[in-house]
A protein has these predicted regions:
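Walker A (P-loop) phosphate-binding loop of P-loop NTPases
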Residues: 10
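Conserved lysine of the Walker
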Residues: 13
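Hydrophobic anchor at the beta1->P-loop junction of P-loop NTPases
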Residues: 5
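Walker A (P-loop) ATP-phosphate-binding motif of ABC ATPase nucleotide-binding domains
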Residues: 2
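Hydrophobic positions on the alpha1 helix immediately C-terminal to the Walker A/P-loop
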Residues: 16
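ATP-dependent small-molecule kinase phosphotransfer cores
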Residues: 34-111, 121, 138-146, 150, ...
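Short, well-ordered beta-strand core segments
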Residues: 128-132, 184-186
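Post-Walker A helix-loop "phosphate-sensing" segment adjacent to the P-loop in P-loop NTPases
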Residues: 21-31, 47-48
């Protein structure tokens, strides 16, 4: 079974995806980490993120499991990630990687949960279950602001909200890789606890598998 979980930043999709994968013993892939991992590997090897050969080589040798303990959320890595993500050949390599992960889950597991921004629409358009997890911008900004503060990073709520609203606008207007698949089931987490969202999705998947 392939479960595609898409949604904007700080909607709660990552937390949900991990819990669903753990509950059903499915393989889990946070696709957002892939571009960061490629950016990190390019820098680690002394390469240039904008250089296609360096970036493609890093993408082709990527082993996400080997980077589980690496902090991929530094500004340097984020900057490198945005540069490698702009290279079509890198996007193609990672698209193939994601599709292979979904079709052949590691460890011989019975299913895969992929969390990202275009899983149901581009990566796995034939996924058995497509979810679009969302929440009001101000709620998502509140969550992200709290998350950054807990990590000891400087953050102000107005700045986080402005960033989230700008990103939402880019997503709404982009023609390539639309965020929400037309046949995805939308779940608004604004006024729901993580447990309530998990229970709702678990029940949907159990019904589907019955």
């Amino acid at each position: 079974m392939i479960v595609a979980i898409d949604g904007p930043a700080a909607a709660g999709k990552g937390t949900l995806a991990r819990r669903i994968a753990g509950h059903f013993d499915f393989a889990f892939l946070d696709t957002g980490r892939l571009y960061r991992a490629v950016g990190y590997l390019v820098l680690e090897k002394g390469g240039e993120p904008k250089n296609e050969a360096d970036a493609v080589k890093a993408a082709q040798t990527l082993d996400p499991g080997a980077l589980e303990t690496v902090d991929l959320h530094t500004e340097t890595v984020a900057d490198a990630a945005s540069k490698v993500a702009a290279i079509p050949a890198v996007r193609q390599v990672l698209l193939d990687f994601q599709r292979d992960f979904a079709a052949n889950p590691p460890g011989g597991k019975a299913g895969a949960v992929l969390d990202g921004r275009d899983i149901g629409s581009v990566v796995c358009p034939d996924a058995d279950m497509k979810l679009f997890i969302t929440a009001r911008p101000e709620i998502r900004a509140e969550r992200r602001h709290k998350e950054l503060q807990e990590k000891g990073l400087e953050s102000t709520y107005p700045a986080v909200l402005a960033e989230i609203e700008a990103r939402d606008e880019r997503d709404r207007t982009r023609k390539v890789s639309p965020l929400q698949a037309g046949d995805a089931r939308e779940i608004d987490t604004s006024d729901k606890t993580p447990d309530a969202v998990f229970d709702e999705v678990r029940a949907i998947i159990e019904d589907l598998a019955a």
